[in-house]
Structures are given as C-alpha cells and as structure tokens.
Design a protein with these regions (language model features):
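A generic "binding-loop/recognition-motif" signal
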Residues: 15, 37, 46, 74, ...
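N-terminal beta-strand motif that seeds the catalytic metal site of vicinal oxygen chelate
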Residues: 1-20, 46-47, 64-69, 116-126
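N-terminal first-folded block
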Residues: 7-43
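Vicinal oxygen chelate
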Residues: 5-13, 56-126
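Short linear motifs in intrinsically disordered
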Residues: 27-32, 70, 91-94
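Conserved short beta-strand elements that form part of the metal-binding/catalytic scaffold
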Residues: 28-62, 111-117
Length: 126
C-alpha cells in the first residue's frame, strides 16, 4: 500500500524506564539494535524504534505528531498507564460511530492516544 506509515520512533530521556513502561502498557518487546541506546519495537506487526532523545523536550501538549494505538480495552490500558508511571491527560471520550479514546503522557512526557474502535467502524474499513 503506498503512502502509509511504515516506521515510527519514540524519543525518550531514559530508555530503560520507557521500555518498562511500553512493555507494561502494550506488551511490546524491544530488541537492542544498531547504535547504543537504540531499540527496535516488536509486537502486533509494528515497525518502530525507541531511542534516546537528542535534545531536551520543550513545551507541553501535542508536539507535532500524534500516534494513537488501537487497543481491545481502553479502560484497561488507562489503568496500566497509571500503574506504569504515566498520566492519563484526557479521560475516556466517546466518539460516536468510531470508538472510545484516551490520551496519556508516557514516562518521557510523550503524548500518546489509545482507542478501542467500534466493531462496525473496523468492519467498514476492511
């Protein structure tokens, strides 16, 4: 498929802390790869990386890109986020005919969305 997202990167201050967070929240695994502090993200057909931020993060809120992860149970993810040290920044919001969405900050102050899509919405997209 042309023009689709093929690879993404999560920039972090503390790689060990961030890896522990994403393992706990989404069950992703990480493979040490390439330069020091650079990890490939594995899980559910993902192609991504997690690595040390090259410069300090400034500001708050959305910083350019937003990634939303499709999940089976957005309430369970919200609980895992808090347990793993993240902060839910927008509680569950229902988007009619689409699904339920939360936003959270990970342990590295990155803003992430998690959404449980309605079955009818998913079926219409396939």
């Amino acid at each position: 498929m042309p023009n689709h997202v093929k690879f993404f990167s999560i920039m972090v201050d503390d790689t060990a802390r961030a890896i522990a967070f994403y393992e706990a929240v989404f069950g992703w695994t990480f493979e040490d790869w390439g330069p020091p502090g650079f990890y490939l993200i594995r899980g559910a057909g993902l192609e991504g990386s997690l690595h040390k931020r090259q410069e300090p993060l400034t500001g708050t809120g959305f910083r350019a890109f937003e990634i939303t992860v499709g999940v089976d149970d957005v309430d369970a993810i919200a609980a895992r986020v808090v347990k793993a040290g993240g902060v839910v920044t927008m509680p569950k919001m229902r988007i009619e005919t689409v699904g339920s969405l939360i936003y959270f900050n990970d342990t590295e102050a990155n803003r992430v969305g998690a959404m449980t899509y309605d079955a009818a919405y998913e079926a219409a997209r396939t």
